[in-house]
Each structure stands twice: as structure tokens, then as C-alpha cells.
Amino acid sequence: MSTMNVLICQQPKELVWKQREIPIPGDNEALIKIKSVGICGTDIHAWGGNQPFFSYPRVLGHEICGEIVGLGKNIADLKNGQQVAVIPYVACQQCPACKSGRTNCCEKISVIGVHQDGGFSEYLSVPVANILPADGIDPQAAALIEPFAISAHAVRRAAIAPGEQVLVVGAGPIGLGAAAIAKADGAQVVVADTSPARREHVATRLELPLLDPSAEDFDAQLRAQFGGSLAQKVIDATGNQHAMNNTVNLIRHGGTVVFVGLFKGELQFSDPEFHKKETTMMGSRNATPEDFAKVGRLMAEGKITADMMLTHRYPFATLAETYERDVINNRELIKGVITF
């Protein structure tokens, strides 16, 4: 077989099947037969035409697990038949960020499935620098290494230590991942979300304390969880302006806020509150190879699992016909994976 099925987002709200030649891996590339692909908010927003800096047509999908079925030249440490996850961030390796090891915020970053074609296809050729061995991990779990890695990067940015009291605001996939990883790192974790369904999901899957940030006594409830104090570290995964503006009110003096959720606008908070607490506030973008490696290790150890965030599975063969109904309009969806 020399051709493959590819699902292309031709334009907003239009997914079409096409046949393409199976790519031939170039030097320092591996050909991957796709096993599973996670569905991200990026894939949903791109379908709706709401993803900035996005061009059509595009093959979506950047949370990828597959099996190596072909290797280019100059590759010694990978082999055919090996299961791998894809690190979708292709960095230039030349800008100041890359040279300082922060390839996650490369000035010229190109993301597989966003800026170049991704995993909604049967095969994909990937630079070997963007491959993480994932043998021994369930393929659906391995497809979720990427979102877990984003969570791991936020936890690393927060410099969370064992025993620290951490509040995660927002119980979508990234917030769930951050809570799970902070817990695995030994922190005392509380999760806040306004959605009853998401709070129930966290209570069932992660067995962590849950709070409703819209409750009138939210401050008192938070202090009750942390022995009378506010949080030492807050990770905000909401991307919600009001929630992000309020984070400075949720940390104790000397506390840290990390924004891993993105709001496409301006934020505003009390400067006196910010200063008197000597707040450390930072953003968290994408993930580095070190974050991917940590997630792979935690999955292999059973400390984080796909079931912590995964709620739905979709067969690739019928995705064009079911995407709008079962993904876009599915109010119960927290995290979905495409199976091949």
C-alpha cells in the first residue's frame, strides 16, 4: 500500500477525507503508523474557525502515539516496531530561547497539527528529535503524554515541592493533569472549578478535595483546606479573565501564580495586593523534552493514568461524519482520543 487516508480540515466546519501518498522519511526522520491521537481544544477551535494564526487546509492532531515503521538515514537509537509519542513542537534551535534550553517558547516554533500537518492521518513522518519512546504504555495513554506534559511544565514552573499547598483552578484536561502531577510530586492539592460535572470527575478520578470558586464562602473553604492559610502556589488553567484576575487574592504572602490557561486579552489585578504579597507571577507555555520524559516515567510507574482525564473514544474511520455531533457539540466531553 502506497497511499493513506487523511482527514483534512479544508476550511472552518469542513472535514474531508483525502488519499495521500505515504511519506518517505528523510534523513533524521521516522515514519510513524498512527495508533491514537488526542483531541485538544486547538482541534475544536480550528474546526470552528476560532484558532488564531491558523491557516487552511490543515491536517489537525498534535497529541500523537504511533509505531515506527520506517527510518531515514543517520538514526541509531530507534528501531522499527517501537512505540513512540510525538513531541509536536518543532523548534528552530537558533533563537535565544532555544539556545537557553527553552525550546517550548522558540521564537519561530512550528507545531505539528497546527502550523504543519498532524496526526489525523494513518501515517506521519516526524523528526527523530521530536520522538519519545513509549513502549509499555497503553497507546491511548501515550497519546495523552503531550497534554500531561503541558501540565508538568506548569508544575515545574511553579517549583512545587513535597508538602506544599497547591490550588489548581480549572478542571479541564490541563488542570486535571497539573493536579495529578502535583499530587504525584507530593504536594497537598485542592482543585476549584465552577462546573459540577468537572468537580465530580475530579473527585472520582483523582480523589482530591473540590471547591466551587463561585461560592460566597470560597475563601473560607480554601483556608479550611490549608489550615487557615491561602495557597502557597496557584496554577490557573481556566483561560478565564475573571478567574485569572482573581488569582492574586488566592495566594498567601510570598506565594506564586502560574498561568497555563491563555486569555486572549488583557488582565487586571490589584497592584497593592500583588506587591504586599511579593507575588511571583509567570506564564507557562507548551512543554520541553524534559517534561515529556517526566510524564512518560510517571505513566510507566502508574502515578498518572489516561483515565484521569479521558472520557470519550472515537474511531478514526468515521470521524469526519461524527466530529461535529460527538466532539464539537458534546457537553460531557472532557478529553477524547481517536483510535485507529
From Swiss-Prot:
Keyword NAD attributed: yes
Phenotype seen when the gene is deleted: Cells lacking this gene fail to grow on L-galactonate as sole carbon source.
Regulation: Inhibited by EDTA.
Cofactor: Zn(2+)
Cofactor, how bound (note): Binds 2 Zn(2+) ions per subunit.
Pfam families linked to this entry: ADH_N, ADH_zinc_N
Reaction equation(s) it catalyzes: L-galactonate + NAD(+) = keto-D-tagaturonate + NADH + H(+)
Documented EC number(s): 1.1.1.414
Record key words, sorted: Metal-binding, NAD, Oxidoreductase, Zinc
Disulfide bonds: none
InterPro entries per UniProt: ADH-like_C, ADH-like_N, ADH_Zn_CS, GroES-like_sf, NAD(P)-bd_dom_sf, PKS_ER, Zn_alcohol_dh
Gene Ontology MF term list: oxidoreductase activity, acting on the CH-OH group of donors, NAD or NADP as acceptor; zinc ion binding
Gene Ontology biological process: L-galactonate catabolic process
pH dependence remark: Optimum pH is 8.0.
Positions bound to Zn(2+) 2: C92, C95, C98, C106
SUPFAM superfamilies: GroES-like, NAD(P)-binding Rossmann-fold domains
Residues that, per the record, bind Zn(2+) 1: C40, C65, E146
Role: Catalyzes the oxidation of L-galactonate to D-tagaturonate. Required for growth on L-galactonate as the sole carbon source. In vitro, can also use L-gulonate.
Family note: Belongs to the zinc-containing alcohol dehydrogenase family.
Protein name: L-galactonate-5-dehydrogenase
Gene: lgoD
